[in-house]
Amino acid sequence: NEDIREFFTEPAEAKEFAERTKCDALAVCFGTMHGIYAEPPVLDIDRVKELREAIPDDTRIVMHGASGVEFDQVQNAITAGCSKVNYYSYMAKATTKFVADKVAETDGKIAYHELQEAAYEFMKGYAKDVIKAFKNGK
């Protein structure tokens, strides 16, 4: 995680950008990246708090790359001021495994529309679980 600290969003720069552009949301770096991590990242929650204090109240803070981040760290980031969490890689990976297992389980005899429906329901359930885990208690 130390290797990416130089890329962390600076609160003063975020404030200037948000005020100049009047953006609705701002994706910031405080320890996450897109994709699958080799080792779990450690989030700089204090940086999120500093960013939340610096940027306008109507500009939402976005966390990219939440797959692989411990759920309690994501919850801490939400409590500190993140309003949007992008989480996809692990969900896609789990759904791909589900589809492969379903094809193997049926010896390849499952019809495409049945496979698609099963994959959709699996991913929907996974997404609901993630949403519940990331729910803000405020």
Regions found by a protein language model. Give the residues of each.
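Extended, intrinsically disordered, low-complexity segments
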Residues: K102-K138
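Alpha/beta enzyme core
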Residues: N1-D57, F71-A80, K93, K97-A100, ...
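Active-site mouth loops of central-metabolism enzymes
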Residues: N1-P11, V62-G65, Q116-A119
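Short glycine/proline-rich, acidic loop/turn segments that cap or connect secondary-structure elements
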Residues: Y87-G108
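Hydrophobic faces of well-ordered beta-strands that scaffold small-molecule active sites
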Residues: L26-V28, I61-G65, S83-Y87
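P-loop/Walker A phosphate-binding loop and immediately adjacent motor/lid segment at beta-alpha junctions
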Residues: D58-R60, D107-G108
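Catalytic cores of large soluble enzymes that bind and process phosphate-bearing ligands
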Residues: E6, P40, Y87, M91, ...
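Short, surface-exposed acidic/glycine-rich loop or hinge patches that mediate macromolecular interfaces
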Residues: S67-G68, Y90
